């Protein structure tokens, strides 16, 4: 029985299409296949299909590669395994870091960088600790003030004693008084610029306090500087005070050696720099600012907003006087007692006048501007003195025995004026607070060795009596007792 296989062959002949059918028997299969005169021109088998070489172009490329293997029979048909060639991916050569410096120096540089970062992180935590303990102190004082003014003093069974009357009156009077000695007249930074001083970057306090207000209103459980830099407030960007300006404007704080270049002395009634003995000459374009330290040293420099200001000279320390001046060839022409950082009083201005007179500076033709169109930072003390007299006349003066027995709420005791340096604030002021508040603040910023669950932290207290209050009582001596004077 023969097997007839039909194959179709198409040829063009004289413009026509012809077809042929071939048939052969099974026993003649080998003979026909081996015959060079085989009439079958193309088989239906895929094995014999080949692309003519002349039809290949340069743009052709092989994507699939058919590899012949042992044919598998499936329902009488020959099946072949088709393998897909995977593309070869050559990985990039590893980058070899090359430095002319020896490996030991590179390791030392990496170690230094790590130390600098850890140091900054520690200083930021300490700054947060100072803010937190200050806020805790506010809350303690608010509670004490509430007790003093409570209606319980006027209950039927408990009458207010002369001691408590005197304590309340003294507290009231101290809010308007600035002390008696010259040291007590020294002005420290307002709250917004106190934040600037303890900030490791010394970002301009005018910008910083707007973000402080946002943090205070947020009731966040994170400390302020942590919240601002890497915490929940890192994406806060105020439209009127953008973060780009906040990060750009950083005040330069001078160290002890740098400060000497700005020290001014008086020779023959003229102001000149101690180093170089060059006379001071002010220009209309640049504003000359001055600071008189508590040690009676005068410093003068050019103001650059957001970069160099009154707080730069003493690294945020206390001042006896601060303001602006105009001088030509060392001869003083005008002085303004203006400083947004220190908010000097009229008494501070008088101290500066006294300093100039002691050094034989001719003030006859010097323009003294306490208040003008551009600057008006004076705090009048005349009305305050009258109020103090009225308060002292209204209250009963306690006896010597009662004076010794009254609670220790003494606002006269002052804290140290030196608590920061040009290379970064020393947050030693935290030690001025009671131990209990110190421990709470250290726990809040995760610097305490005590182990306490994180969920036990509540919002950072910020019980400001009014949003308008911009001065920390501990720093500006508004009459709230010093932490050293109260035992919790």
Swiss-Prot record:
Main localisation: cytoplasm
Compositional bias ranges of the Basic and acidic residues kind: 388-403
Domain of life: Eukaryota
A GO cellular component annotation in the UniProt record: nucleus
Biased composition (Polar residues): 32-46
Tissue: Highly expressed in leaf mesophyll cells. Expressed in roots, rosette and cauline leaves, stems, flowers and siliques.
Entry GO MF terms: calmodulin binding
Mutant phenotype after disruption: Reduced primary root length. Reduced stomatal aperture.
InterPro entries found in the cross-reference section: IQM (IPR044159)
Expression induction or repression: By light, cadmium and lead. Down-regulated by salt stress and treatment with mannitol.
Swiss-Prot/TrEMBL keywords: Cytoplasm, Nucleus
Localization, UniProt: Cytoplasm; Nucleus
GO biological process, one term: regulation of stomatal movement
Segments forming domain IQ: 106-135
Sequence segments annotated as region (Disordered): 20-46, 377-403, 448-472
Function: Involved in the modulation of stomatal movement. Promotes stomatal opening. May play a role in the regulation of chitin signaling. May be involved in biotic and abiotic stress responses.
Subunit comment: Interacts (via IQ domain) with CAM5.
Protein's recorded name: IQ domain-containing protein IQM1
